[in-house]
């Protein structure tokens, strides 16, 4: 069966082969006229990334890219991304890639309008309320692997470059406005990454199914995926 469908849970998701062709429309829906595509170094020069940039450019949205992203993104990557965002006078982010690109893209969109340091927004208590919610830029997310689920998450994992500890940066508006899930973007992955991200997705579903916080829709989705 070939699935091509739209749904919201609660993020608006466009799923189907070839739907990366809708990237410009997704930006328009999100209110983005001058996006910064954030991805990792490995993906930056790949055909799928260049195709996406071409689609944006053809629609008059430019082809700006930031790819100074480590496998475990840190606050230095975030600061550099925010600097690129401001220098280019962008008004939104296309977070593109696996967990690294998605997490950092979300953080760049979040921090671009903030004045406090990133660690002031760690997922502790109500620290997320410190943020200027109206200053958070819109996000369109495009996952290129099956595993992380960051495209539908309200947080990003950022590594402290000094302590080497991973921290969760949280805000409800980390949720992208639109997600494009195009299976064709995953075809070129190495076998071990395909296997690893598939198991990652499976593990997320096991966790959701076994959670003591019962949610019938989450249980149904978890069972279907497993």
Predicted regions and their residues:
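Electropositive phosphate-/nucleotide-binding environments in soluble metabolic enzymes
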Residues: 13-21, 46, 50, 75, ...
């Amino acid at each position: 069966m070939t699935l091509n469908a739209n749904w919201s849970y609660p993020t608006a998701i466009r799923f189907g082969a070839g739907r990366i062709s809708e990237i410009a429309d997704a930006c328009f829906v999100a209110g983005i006229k001058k996006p910064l595509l954030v991805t990792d170094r490995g993906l930056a020069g790949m055909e799928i990334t260049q195709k996406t940039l071409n689609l944006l450019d053809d629609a008059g949205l430019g082809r700006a890219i930031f790819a100074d992203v480590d496998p475990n993104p840190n606050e230095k990557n975030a600061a550099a991304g925010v600097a690129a965002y401001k220098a280019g006078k962008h008004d939104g982010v296309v977070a593109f890639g696996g967990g690294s690109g998605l997490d950092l893209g979300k953080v760049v969109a979040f921090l671009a309008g903030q004045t406090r340091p990133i660690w002031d927004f760690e997922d502790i208590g109500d620290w997320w309320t410190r943020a200027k919610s109206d200053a958070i830029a819109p996000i369109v997310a495009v996952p290129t692997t099956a595993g992380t689920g960051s495209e539908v998450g309200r947080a990003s994992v950022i590594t402290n470059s000094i302590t080497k500890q991973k921290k969760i940066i949280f805000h409800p508006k980390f949720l992208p406005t639109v997600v494009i899930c195009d299976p064709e973007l995953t075809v070129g992955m190495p076998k071990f990454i395909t296997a690893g991200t598939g198991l990652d997705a499976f593990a997320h579903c096991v966790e959701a199914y076994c959670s003591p916080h019962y949610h019938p829709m989450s249980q149904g989705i978890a069972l279907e995926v497993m």
